[in-house]
Regions:
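Extended intrinsically disordered or low-complexity segments
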Residues: 1-272
Length: 272
């Protein structure tokens, strides 16, 4: 992603065919096998590093442990370096499924790497780390504070970054404005390189309060969602309203701006 030839985001993933962590008895550790041939690899977190498994030191009735940053992934196992196969207590010597998607600048070289970043382009689930850590602390003190309240509010240490579901390396510093150039490479054999330019739109919200006051606020382009199955790019402009303002109606206006030109347009066209 770039703006006027200035790079904003540059992310490269490496995809392989199926591969396994093979047990090397002479070294008492696992190493990744060579990948098998593959015509296509789905871009899914299930194929990125992560997963769940049993710790050999746990009681037989213990619940499985999960990789906090990607519980549905492949290649991670709980406990000692030799690990156990997810869903069963298989022999150490059995091959263990490895990840097929990794960061090009940080290939996996060892098993059970707790700090390895799950590789993907999709949103991060709210109950995955590091997003979950931003949700705050919900303990007995929090429950007591809201005991007589009509609704439960966020914790005092809640961080609004919790609402950001994009991977950290896909967040544009300073935000988007439109007119950025989007380039995708290597996703399709039939179209090795794809390029699109985001529209430069000014969208403004006219908010009317219950007391008859009006307030005009520019909306921000804050989300770009790429649907590779449908070959569509979805854009979201967002506005946050203060509940205390008692907003009863919102009208939206938009106008296309020349590429590379900032500032508000002189006239608006209503769209809602």
């Amino acid at each position: 992603l770039s703006r006027e030839e200035t790079p904003l985001l540059d992310k490269t993933l490496r995809l392989t065919g199926p591969r396994h962590w093979d047990w090397q008895p002479e070294a008492a550790q696992r190493t990744l096998s060579a990948p098998q041939p593959a015509l296509a690899v789905p871009l899914r977190y299930e194929l990125a590093y992560g997963g769940w498994g049993f710790d050999p030191g746990d009681d037989a009735s213990a619940a499985p442990r999960t990789h906090a940053a990607n519980p549905c992934g492949s290649g991670w196992f709980a406990g000692a370096a030799q690990g156990q196969h997810p869903g069963a207590r298989h022999a150490v010597e059995q091959p263990f499924p490895g990840p097929q998607i990794e960061h090009a600048d940080a290939p996996l070289s060892q098993a059970n790497h707790e700090d390895a970043r799950p590789a993907g382009f999709a949103p991060i689930a709210r109950f995955w780390q590091p997003r979950l850590a931003l949700a705050g602390t919900y303990d007995d003190a929090w429950r007591e504070r809201h005991r007589d309240q009509p609704y439960m509010d966020y914790a005092e240490d809640f961080d609004e970054g919790f609402f950001q579901y994009a991977p950290a390396d896909q967040v544009v510093a300073g935000g988007l404005r439109g007119d950025e150039t989007l380039r995708l490479s290597g996703f399709f054999a039939s179209a090795p390189d794809l390029e699109a330019r985001l529209p430069r739109l000014w969208i403004e919200a006219l908010c009317r309060g219950g007391d008859g006051t009006e307030r005009s606020t520019a909306m921000k382009l804050d989300t770009v969602h790429i649907d590779l199955d449908e070959m569509l790019v979805h854009l979201t402009w967002r506005l946050t309203l203060d509940q205390a303002l008692d907003t009863v109606a919102v009208d939206l206006f938009e106008r296309a701006l020349p590429q590379g030109i900032g500032g508000a347009p002189a006239a608006m066209e209503t769209i809602g």
